[in-house]
Design a protein with these regions (language model features):
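Active-site-adjacent "subsite" loops/lids of carbohydrate-active enzymes
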Residues: 27-47, 125-200, 249-260, 311-314, ...
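Catalytic domains of carbohydrate-active enzymes, especially glycoside hydrolases
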Residues: 49-75, 200-201, 332-342, 408-413
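Aromatic-lined carbohydrate-binding/catalytic grooves of carbohydrate-active enzymes
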Residues: 62-104
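Glycine-rich, aromatic-flanked loop segments that form ligand/cofactor-binding clefts
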Residues: 62-73, 108-169, 207-210, 287-292
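Aromatic- and acidic-residue-enriched segments that line the glycan-binding/catalytic groove
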Residues: 77-90, 131-170, 210-250, 304-316
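Substrate-binding cleft/loops of secretory-pathway carbohydrate-active enzymes
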Residues: 132-135, 139-140, 216, 285, ...
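Active-site neighborhood of glycoside hydrolase catalytic domains
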Residues: 192-193, 200, 205-209, 214-215, ...
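Substrate-binding cleft of secreted/luminal carbohydrate-active enzymes
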Residues: 324-431
């Protein structure tokens, strides 16, 4: 997810029927995301404000909240024997990079569970997955810095300057430090943490965010653990490393060759298999726990992130022009049938509510239904603070129109983020 100014014949007939929009929006849920960093000043040390605003959220018409309890630093806001507790939140503070201290000792997640349930809300824990540190000028914070041996867990990226650089020491970017999803130690750490959450008293669900490769896109994932896993997948050492010989890849500008295709497929297989393990681990602890994932709706370019969030039944090569190269092996990495629900970020400018294509909220939701093929309920919605036309507020009247439009196509509504409701005083909106 993005924060920006706040601190993703008979069988055919059955398939088409599964992908048709519902004729009624009655009873469809409405999810609200509560980002940890962006809302820390309001709730990090104030349980009374949590209780007050859960009531206000319910009054707006939301049915579910997703409480981010593991920001990109990798510290956590719940009781854990696995992950370090968050004692201070890094970010932009008073005109420079710094920290906001957490001085309270109440259980942040439990406070939201208690207050949310009292207000009639279902409460889900949002978890940033493939991250474990935070870096800015003068700041190196989080578990990969507290325990330097864990820097070997980080993604290694092929930068534009032609260098392979560990994300923990990369100074080109500010913010979260990404971990390599192919690293077995990373996976086991995250699975153990999810098991703790699955045992949390009263928690209704878990939503994974950033369960993907890092923002260097196709140039991400070149750690030693990644190389070993890819070699195992190939059954031989890769003839090129990095696989893409020209750094700075943003989009595919040609049909990938055999090794490049295998690399793109490998990364999606890593994420697919991790999601399967995560779902199993959570449901072993609590079979009734809802287990979901957030993804961006812009699937036409999602190969960049190493995630295939579609149904494995969905014929990518024939249905998606930007995936004409996709093999049956790539199609099989579709993960939609592994989760209980999906949050789909239909992030667009405020002017792009209606339409049938990507880059419109309605189109994103419509295409989401087509791509998921009935495998999983999905809840779609906008970022109402960072996209063009939203960044200065003043869109209170538009929000119910967006919600009604999206709920005609999706199984429910999702909105990012509570910080924008607070910033622009949208509390009087009613859905």
């Amino acid at each position: 997810m993005r924060l920006g100014n706040c601190l993703i014949v008979g069988a055919l007939a059955a398939l088409l029927g599964a992908c048709a929009p519902s004729s009624s929006t009655a009873g469809k849920p409405r999810f609200l995301w509560i980002d940890a960093a962006a809302n820390f000043s309001g709730y990090g040390n104030d349980a009374d404000s949590i209780a007050r605003d859960c009531r206000r959220i319910a009054e707006m018409g939301f049915t579910d909240i997703v409480v981010d309890v593991r920001p990109t630093s990798g510290d956590v806001l719940f009781a854990s024997a696995v992950a370090p507790a968050l004692k201070k939140m890094p970010g932009w503070v008073g005109g420079g990079w710094g920290f906001r201290e957490r001085t309270a000792d109440f259980d942040y997640l439990q406070a939201f569970i208690d207050a949310g349930h009292a207000a009639g809300l279902s409460v889900h824990a949002g978890v940033n997955m493939m991250v474990g540190g935070w870096k800015a000028p003068g700041i190196e914070h989080g578990m990969v810095y507290d325990r330097p041996e864990r820097q070997a867990w980080c993604s290694v990226d092929y930068r534009k300057d032609g260098q392979l650089v560990n994300h923990a020491v990369d100074s080109e970017t500010v913010g979260g430090r990404f971990l390599d999803p192919a690293n077995p130690e990373v996976q086991e750490f995250l699975l153990s943490m999810l098991a703790e959450l699955a045992a949390y008293e009263g928690l209704d669900g878990i939503v994974m965010d950033r369960c993907r490769y890092d923002d260097y896109a196709m140039d991400a994932g070149y750690s030693e653990a990644g190389r070993q896993a890819f070699a195992t997948c190939l059954g031989r050492e890769p003839e090129r490393w990095p696989v893409f010989t020209e750094p700075g890849h943003i989009f595919l500008d040609k049909v990938p060759d055999e090794l490049e295709n295998r690399w793109l497929t490998f990364r999606c297989r890593v994420i697919h298999d991790f999601v399967a393990k995560a779902a199993d681990r959570v449901h072993e602890v609590n079979p009734d726990m809802g287990f979901g994932i957030y993804v961006g709706a812009w699937f036409s370019e999602y190969y960049r992130s190493g995630v295939n969030w579609t149904s494995p039944k969905y014929d990518l090569a024939s249905e998606e022009p930007t995936y004409a190269w996709a093999t049956p092996e790539y199609q099989a990495t579709g993960l939609a049938d592994l989760v209980d629900f999906m949050l789909l970020g239909t992030y667009c400018p405020a002017a792009n509510v209606h339409g049938r294509t990507e880059k419109t909220m309605e189109g994103f939701a419509r295409l989401g239904r087509k791509r998921l093929c009935g495998d999983v309920p999905f809840y779609a919605g906008p970022d109402i603070g960072n996209e063009k036309g939203f960044e200065k507020g003043g869109q209170m009247a538009l929000l119910p129109e967006i919600e009604a439009t999206i709920r005609q196509e999706a199984d429910g509504f999702f909105l990012f983020d509570l910080c924008h409701i607070r910033m622009f005083d949208y509390w009087d909106v009613r859905f």
